[in-house]
Amino acid sequence: MSKLKTLNRQFISNLETHKVTTDAKRNLILSILKSTTTKREAKNYLTKYQNQFDFNDDLDFNKNIKIKNEQLSLTNRDSQRELFINRFLNQSNPFINIYDREDVKLQKVPLRLAIFKIKFTKITIKQWKGIAETFKRLITLGISPIIMLDYDHLPSNSFKNNELYMINQGNKMLNYLGRPEEESDLKVTLLRSLFTSHKGVPTLDSLESILIPLYQGIIPIIQPIVYNADASKQEFLESDKLLLGLSSALIEKRTTDLLSIEKIVMIDPMGGIPSIERRQTSHVFINLSQEYSDILSELFIGHIEPKYRDTHVNNLNTMNNVLSFINEKSGNDETTGIITTPEIMSINIDQLNPIIYNVLTDRAIISSSLPSTTNRTPHLSTTIIKKGVDVQIFDIDNYDKDLTMQNLFDDKLVNKEKLINLLNDSFGKSLDVDPYLDRINDNIATVVIVGDYDGAAIITWEYSKGEKIAYLDKFAIAKKNQGLPGLADVIFKIILQSHPFELIWRSRKNNPVNKWYFERCCGCMSAPDSQWKIFYTGEVFDKKIDRFKRNPRHKNGVVNIDRKLQQYSEICEGITPSFK
């Protein structure tokens, strides 16, 4: 009878454990779907991180019966990590392939790394508690964090005093982030002297000293102490050099299926890179391939104090160096840079924490192409950075011939076949090529090509009542890139910067993109009997609008809105459709 009671208690306990596990998995999936705004974002996240979760694991109700064979266990994340640790400890190569009993090669479950460089000043205990919760959430979402401590603010003349200070701060940080003996807390370990420096270049002595804690679910915290091989002594190294050294070691000493660096995060009290356009608040998104030199120049025009400017310049340069290196070595642009404040990292709401939100969606909390002058666009202290895509812009300022499509084709600046294929693919229709090119050939205002024809925009000059008005004739993104973050914003931002004074475009009334357009325009209109919705924007609408038509002539500082809308309607309704 007692044996039956024991089995009954065990069965009830297993049911309760199963319910807790199932609820946790359900809540995780629901939170992912809630935080991602499109089905494609949710799918992209789950495709990348699905192996980090054991969604298909069933509770083993009978622990005396082994229902999983070796092949099944080696497809499991935790089993693979245990195998890698044993290989490390046995001094064998952990990066070699994994096979089952039938010598079938198994896919490895990679570590998805996020490297955090934390500036250890002005972080309150309350913020540390929030930061700890953010790390827990990131781990739940499949991220393996690595923390690097930034002590660059310390004087460089006393190693001993600095070392004592760092030990004290490191111990405090261990307490802030959690104690390993407590089940629900983070597991963290403090590491030092992992690097040897030769001629100022740090190299990682032992990759396993970082990977083993990660495989055990422990967050390594790296102190910026290195062994100087030239001077035979320990010393501090600038955190930015250490960040590049760590990224280099992780990229160069690994196989592509073992780990990936997903995020490079700088936690700095000063926040993201300031933008003049956004009234000194942060750039929302930076496409380094296109914007790096311009933003660097902007920082030096005197709108911020030199000591603050130097910090932002240093952060931007470091991000550019690290992301460019990773891009070159890995051959992809999957690594994202994030610069934000301790206060913002401590926010524990997925949609408001830019780090968590970026893990889920790979984009910023708001769109970078939203107009910064409107009250409905929030101002942020976070900058999202990508190595990004190359951008080609052709307009009258950078082309010394007559700006026609035929000249751009003849000079091989624009590939006609690729452009037409992009337009056909983007719109899902066949372009009526000759009539279309004949219509726009002599009216080109700007042509934008992004990447290898991943996206494009064609802006033409259209005429009404003796005035020429910029018209967004084509805005195309390849189907494989539609719904992906950043690309549409990059193109549309260039469009607005190219024609800031006045721009119009049209879209079919049933186009699902119209909501996106509406958020980026000054206004829109549509006639009941028309198939088109007409959008307009530009600095011209910063002027006073003469709604009562008391000024028949267009005076300086006043815009006759009735006349403008008539012009826009005449242009947009008069252009023949381009597709068959």
Swiss-Prot record:
Predominant subcellular localization, coarse grouping: mitochondrion
Signal peptide start-end: none
| Origin superkingdom | Eukaryota
Q: Which keywords does this Swiss-Prot/TrEMBL entry list?
A: Acyltransferase, Amino-acid biosynthesis, Mitochondrion, Transferase, Transit peptide
The answer to whether keyword Cell inner membrane applies is no
**Coiled-coil positions:** none
- Gene3D superfamilies with a match to the protein in the record: 3.40.630.30
What top-level class of enzyme does the UniProt entry assign?
Answer: transferase
Q: What is its EC number?
A: 2.3.1.1
Family designation: Belongs to the acetyltransferase family.
The name under which this protein is listed is Amino-acid acetyltransferase, mitochondrial
Species the sequence originates in: Candida dubliniensis (strain CD36 / ATCC MYA-646 / CBS 7987 / NCPF 3949 / NRRL Y-17841)
